[in-house]
Amino acid sequence: LILRLLGKGKVAERFKHWKSVKEGFFGLCLENHKTNFDKEQNILIKNGQNYFITNSNRTDPANRILKWKLLFPYELKLPFLMTRFNIDPKPKNFIHPNGVKKIKCISFGTDQNLIPIIKELCDDRTLKLFVGKDVKSVTYEKIKTADNNVYDVHS
């Protein structure tokens, strides 16, 4: 209600959608390597896309205050974006306890006319775009520790 009163109804719609979806992947966040959205704002403005930017923070398990910014396009079929954290909380050379080393591929569906915008926002070859809706699949690179062979896991 507060977002709607502040004229941010489209952001509220995104949150409402997130609340209503079933468990699993349903959206996509693109992370840049900067602390601002200068490049991304120019791309969205050039393509006639409105957006909302907000600051965010949280305390991590090491009791550090992590800060970053979020950009929410009003168009719900575009991914939202985040800047890098002010402190890098990501462990080096980390392999998840389930054996996942990294994300190998994400298939994300959207409208045909939005695909060029997303390609301009994200040049990472991990992201595969198609005409459709939301995240279709995620492929992980997984290490099997017993024989150290690499396996792909699909979800």
What are these regions, as identified by a protein language model?
Residues 1-155:
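Glyoxalase I/VOC metalloenzyme domain signal
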